[in-house]
C-alpha cells in the first residue's frame, strides 16, 4: 500500500511534552495549525509514528488523534496543500 494523507492533532497540557511531540511530527509532515499536522504516511511510517509518540505522551493527560483523510482536501483561505515528500526515519 502506498502513502496516504493523515491529519494528526494533539492536546497536551505540558509544555515540554508538547514541544517534543511537535518536533517529532515535524519530521513526518507539515504543521497546518498550532496543534495539527498533515502527514503522508505508509503503514510502516504510521506504526513508527505511533510507537515514537507513545514514548512521549502521558496517556493519562495527553491526547493524540490520527485521522485518515479520505477523498480530496479542500483549502479555503491561506495555506497550500501538503506536498508528498520522502520521509526517512533514523
From Swiss-Prot:
The residue range of the signal peptide is none
InterPro entries attached to this UniProt entry: CRISPR_associated_Cas2, Virulence_VapD/CRISPR_Cas2
Coiled-coil segments = none
Q: Which GO terms describe its biological process?
A: defense response to virus; maintenance of CRISPR repeat elements
The cysteines covalently paired via disulfide bonds are: none
The record's annotation in Pfam families points to: CRISPR_Cas2
Q: What is this protein called?
A: CRISPR-associated endonuclease Cas2 2
This protein's species is Thermus thermophilus (strain ATCC BAA-163 / DSM 7039 / HB27)
